């Protein structure tokens, strides 16, 4: 009985620790600065690994057919009200988010560029080779796996510190300004974006809700694991 109580207590403490993470941990393969054109091989490797996992997760979410990510819902909602495609709107939204970096003093890097390239390629690979589960329960399970995969990849590439993607950079910048836990900042962003997109006519599914409420804790958990494992 004591063993079970001790286990539950330790598990509760670990949960509180990663949910309260406020900073991106530094490990031996982290770059000293985002604008680093000659990173270490290990830094570049983990950057690409993280972005690959991120793109894989995004692709799995689309393939699950359980609902798109909140930012895709926003793009879809805007596209329904203007004469542009969802893809073009996604680019415009990314540019707008990058402009929000200026007051937050966020710095781009090679990771900011590779973010779009690698994630886009992985999404296409998933859509081409990964079948959509016919069973609704399996679709939801795949959506959960997708959110966890995006969180894991996001944590790894953020620790590489070679420049975040537009949305992750916004998350990091807002965290520094507010000093709130990363899990809360990311969840706030995703829920806000999802709500605006839904109001404009975008389609929200179970996968969208899983992403909106789950990606913050998933990224925080990844940062916690990477920080503990490599230190």
Task: Say what each PLM segment does.
Residues 2-231:
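Core subunits and conserved enzymes of cellular information-processing
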